Amino acid sequence: MEIKYRPEELTKLPRSVEYREGKVYMINQRLLPREFKVEEFTTVEAVAEAIKNMTVRGAPAIGAAAAFGLALYAETSKAKTKDEFFDGFYRAYETLKNTRPTAVNLFWALNRIKKLVEEHREDSLDEIKRLIVEEAQKIADEDVEANLRMGHYGAEVLPEGNILTHCNAGSLATVHLGTVGAVVRVMHKEGTLKLLWLDETRPVLQGARLSAWEYSYDGLNVKLIADNAAAFVMQQGKVDAIIVGADRIVANGDFANKIGTYMLAVLAKEHGIPFFTVAPLSSIDMSLSSGKEIPIEERSPEEVLTCGGCRIAPDVPVYNPAFDVTPHKYLTGIITDRGVVWPPFKRNLKKLFETL
């Protein structure tokens, strides 16, 4: 597969997560679209809180943010001995690990650095610190390259026409470009994307606040709809394919993504519309056999009871799962950075990982 475009040809946005000179920099996604602000983080605790409160969100983005949190610890640690350094490292690791439970990239990135540290325990302290920072940067850079490949793979298999997406799996949800974001940007560049339908994505409105902002910023033709309008738009024949991100894909092809994804998958099947998820290999968890095993985060009732800081409902009990699980039977294909995986997913995902 030929890479035709570089990131700077596809988006004007900067990276959503960066690390420079002992500081983590992240676009504050809670402020968008009212204000674009890159904030600076100087402690592991501050990075962890940013992941928890969704200043940074999106599975690949929080994976990179967590990795940079460990880099930040390494560069700012005042430990005099290796034992002292390792004690602090494992505390930082646990602090970051305990932020959000569903997105597997978080654990993948943290465990990758932890494994590296344990393999180099006998090296000098300075060398261990250097390796941590270098590995965190590699994780971020690899994410951008993976997105670029997914963008090209996805553009090859999606039909020309109108695409519907849910939540935000764009540049803001990754280090740069996005998963879905890379696909629709390559399609836009090649003239095959006619219209990008955006679900508003209640209760936090990532589709309305973030996707609408970033895709219109890059000049894509977008149209925003209420979540409960999706079925009618499909019924009218105005959707040619649906593409969504994934926070965790398991061995049989079931996947967790933003709440409301499962609903779209069922509707797509009813209306005969191709339904794809797109995610890097770091989002695939082969240790789980089915989606029933994925831990689902529940968030504050306030996200449902309020909108933009204004109360919109009486003080009643709320059930607020942040994600749902889509069974693999609804999937047309899984677009990864190593190509498109087609059914049967259990066999073909296993085969994909055996070739790595």
From Swiss-Prot:
One Pfam family linked to the record: IF-2B
EC number(s) reported in the record: 5.3.1.23
Molecular function via GO: S-methyl-5-thioribose-1-phosphate isomerase activity
Catalytic class of the enzyme: isomerase
Position of the signal peptide: none
Annotated site, Transition state stabilizer, chain positions: 167
Superkingdom to which the source organism belongs: Archaea
Family the UniProt entry places it in: Belongs to the eIF-2B alpha/beta/delta subunits family. MtnA subfamily.
Role noted for this protein: Catalyzes the interconversion of methylthioribose-1-phosphate (MTR-1-P) into methylthioribulose-1-phosphate (MTRu-1-P).
Protein name: Putative methylthioribose-1-phosphate isomerase
